[in-house]
A protein has these predicted regions:
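Short aromatic/basic micro-patch
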Residues: 49, 98, 125
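The catalytic Nudix box helix
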Residues: 50-83
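Short, charged/polar surface micro-motifs in flexible loops or helix N-caps
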Residues: 27-32, 40-42, 56-57, 85-87, ...
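NUDIX/MutT-family hydrolases
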Residues: 110, 114-145
């Protein structure tokens, strides 16, 4: 067994995530809820993303996903099923940090997107099929595609 870390071995995906988050693919009919965070991508471009955030101590991943959806978008949702996990590296303070985000398929229950968090510039509904190609991050596009396949087998 090698003692190399995933980074040293050339892997793009971490073996043991040091940072864990949870998020939701919130659907209403054939529409999905997406956000444009105030924080821009590294190249300065706007980001189109799924709502997600850190799992607080003592919180379950599902609890975190529902809370983050509520905080970032202003809507309440209910669980349909789990969609899987996305793993990636990002940079914080010049260091590469491995991260894991578990995503859930959620159904819209109530709420107003105008009540979104101040860290979010915009919340909007868009066609789920369109989100599969237009979300900024590849892992989130894959998760949206899984949601579409789950809803329309």
């Amino acid at each position: 067994m090698s003692s190399e870390s995933p980074r040293e071995a050339g892997s793009r995906r971490p073996a043991r995530p040091r940072e864990r988050s949870a998020g939701g693919v919130v659907v209403r009919g054939e529409q999905v809820l997406v956000i444009v965070p105030r924080r821009r991508a590294a190249d300065g471009e706007r980001v189109l993303a799924l709502p997600k955030g850190h799992i607080d101590p003592g919180e379950t991943p599902l609890g975190a996903a529902l809370r983050e959806v509520r905080e970032e978008t202003g809507v309440e949702a209910e669980l349909v099923g789990e969609l899987g996990e996305v793993r990636y590296w990002y940079r914080r303070g010049g260091r590469a940090v491995p991260k894991s985000v578990v995503f859930y398929l959620l159904r819209y229950v109530a709420g107003d997107t105008a009540d979104h968090d101040e860290e979010v510039e915009e919340v909007r509904w868009m066609a789920l099929a369109r989100a599969c190609t237009e979300l900024t991050y590849e892992g989130e596009r894959e998760i949206a595609s899984r949601a579409l396949a789950t809803l329309d087998p």
